[in-house]
Structure formats: structure tokens, C-alpha cells
Amino acid sequence: MSFDLYVDTSRKGISIAVAAARSNAAGSTPDGCDEAFYKEIVDPEARGETLSKNLDCLLEQSGISLQDIKRIMVTLGPGSFSGLRTGVAFCQGICFSGMRKLYGVSTLEALECFAESQTADSAATTQTAVVVKARKDYWYLRLCGQESFDSTEDVLAKLSANQPKFAVVDATARDDVRLTEFFSTNGIKTILDEGNPLSLWAKLFEKHQPSLIQEANYIQPSYFEKGH
């Protein structure tokens, strides 16, 4: 029986989850695993140094051991330097033995998966924008497979040009007056990036290759900001 571990330290606090491994894009599980098995710990106030403790608690609650984990998916950002550095290094450490494979994915690409779960539309991710706060009046945007760091004006212009059907947003984007008005006026369904199981990211195992070497995306915003 094998399981997947999901680790997200790119947003507020720490989110960590374990789910029955899915062996293919269709979602079947190997070794007679319960496909519905899923446990998570979401601690918005947690800091990086508690990640090991959180994993121990999660494994205990799940009734499994680290040896049962065969694949690990960690978000690579964009996000905070300290959070990403801790999360990526932690996952590299527990994969170093070669007993499990490490997959790194863009946080925005991972969040994009939430649209498909909410709409029951397998094509949803191709019609989805992801908008999360970078800093005041600037956002991380994923649209049509491209990721960028944009002002509110640029985000609105890109959304207007591409007209997505869905938008995965964080609380700040949800509450932004200009973005909210645009979504409402253009009939774009918004999906909050909270409260969704991380196992919805399982489809990304099929898209990405495992590697012990992962580079977190915590420097990119600095390059963009130099131009503003």
C-alpha cells in the first residue's frame, strides 16, 4: 500500500496532506488502497520549524509510516523566501535516501487544479486564471499556462483579452473591488484557494518528472519589482 504526500509552504503557514496514491491520470489506486483516503493538517500560523512535527502528527493520525510514502509533491512558489526554502529543503531531505520520488510544482499551477474540482469540467484548467496577492496592487497571475507578476491594471487587461471562465483567487483578490467587479461583470466564476484538498493536485504527477533537485521561485518577484 503506497501513499502520496503533499507539502505547501508557499502560502500562509503550512499545509500538509497524505492521500492514497493514484497510479494514473484516470485516478485508479494501486495495491487495493482506499481511493477516498485523505488526511491533512492546515496550520495558517505554523512556521517552517514545525514542519517535521506536523508530518509526524499527520502520519500518526493516518496510521501509516514514512516508509509508506512513495511520492512527495512540494509547491515551489511564487511565495515567501523562508517558507519555500524550508518546505523544499525538508522534502529534499526525506527523499534523499531514494526511497521516494520528489515532484516540484508551481504553486499557481497547483491552485489551478482547484477549478476542475469545483466545476466537474475536465477542461476547466485551460479556461482558468489564478490570481493571488504578491504585494499591494500587484499580483501573481497564471493565465493560459503563463505566469507573471503584474499590476492590477495589467491583470485586468490580460483577463479582458483572454476571458477565462474561472478564476482561482486568494482572499485578497476576492475582496479587491476592481477585480471583483471585473469577475462579476464578465461572468467569471471565482473559486477561493482555501478549503480544497491538496490531493486534487495528483494529476500533476503525470505532467512533471521527479527530481531531487528543485528550485523554489522566491527570487523572481525581486527582478520584476526592479522595473517598477
List where the protein language model places each region:
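DPxDG-like acidic metal-binding loop motif
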Residues: R71-L102, T107
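N-terminal beta-alpha supersecondary unit
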Residues: M1-V74
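Generic recognition of short, well-ordered alpha-helical segments
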Residues: T50, R85-A89, R178
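Short, basic/glycine-rich phosphate-binding loops at helix/coil junctions
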Residues: D34, Q92-I94, Y138
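Buried hydrophobic packing segments
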Residues: L55, F90-I94, L111-A115
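Oxyanion-binding and handling regions
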Residues: M1-A19, S23, S106-H228
